């Protein structure tokens, strides 16, 4: 017997998928959209360092690091939002980003918060 109200504690990154269902599980309840939003800006030092990296071409590691951190933070906020809803899984997870202003970017991570039970 599974207590769905207590199973929200089992929401881990392994129970987040971009698919519309979680393999090996049955969705028993949809709880709505879970989301995490983070707005990041580049520092003057970071912008200068990245500008220097563009001269040589290739991966701009300063921006890559900033983007990775923003995505991680948005993901963690989405998990926290899903836990508040009582979810133990998230399906149809997506990322999106928008430049709000010069050097200011919004990153959103969202998906459908659900309660699942393992298939028999």
Swiss-Prot record:
UniProt superkingdom: Bacteria
A Pfam family the protein falls into: YbjQ_1
Cystine pairings recorded for this chain: none
Membership in a protein family: Belongs to the UPF0145 family.
Please report the name of this protein according to its UniProt entry.
UPF0145 protein Bcep1808_3406
Q: What is the species listed in this Swiss-Prot or TrEMBL entry?
A: Burkholderia vietnamiensis (strain G4 / LMG 22486)
């Amino acid at each position: 017997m599974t207590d769905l109200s207590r199973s929200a504690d089992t929401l881990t990154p392994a129970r987040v998928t971009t698919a519309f269902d979680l393999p090996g599980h049955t969705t028993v309840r949809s709880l709505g959209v879970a989301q995490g939003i983070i707005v990041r800006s580049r520092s003057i030092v970071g912008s200068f360092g990245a500008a220097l990296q563009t001269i040589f071409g290739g991966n701009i590691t300063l921006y890559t690091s900033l983007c990775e951190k923003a995505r991680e933070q948005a993901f963690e906020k989405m998990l926290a939002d899903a836990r508040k809803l009582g979810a133990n899984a998230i399906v149809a997870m997506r990322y999106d980003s928008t430049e709000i202003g010069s050097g200011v970017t919004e990153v959103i991570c969202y998906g459908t918060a659900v309660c699942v039970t393992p298939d028999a």
